[in-house]
Amino acid sequence: YDDKNGINTTIKDGVTLGDPVGTKVYEDGLNNSATTENSLLKSLGITNPNNDAYTVSFDKTITTTTEKSNGQTITYSYNESGTILTAKRTDEKTVFTVELKKDASGKDVYDFQLKEAMDHEYGNNGKNDFDLPFKFNVTSNGMTSDNKTFNVTVVDSVPNAKDKTVTTNEDT
């Protein structure tokens, strides 16, 4: 309240970008359609206390990654609104998709789906994973935020070296 002019004002908080939640996906999940370990929904960390209108979109200036799949370069393309990123190899196979969307409760999430195995460097002190960073922003009331980044860690499907007993039946 402004005593001098008799004016009441209300300050409204707008859309706020918190910290997005990173996640891990496992290439082992590519071999078993019953598993969901290669497709995950995680929070973008957006709060909107006053239900302001806003849009979320990827930074569409990022068009490639240094990572590869089957020895091939991976390039990114986006839908018109910038909410779906599709990563394809040189041979046009889709390696993964990432979608910015609302979950069933209305919260902003990203949906990462790994479709093809990615190349990993071996002998890196047992490290068989790497991070894929994704940048996004929010536009509200004509203003676009700075980019925020979430990471998806891709874990290689490394076989376990264990003793196994195998029985074979031969013709007699």
Regions inferred by a protein language model and the residue ranges of each:
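Acidic/polar, solvent-exposed loop/turn segments
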Residues: 1-172
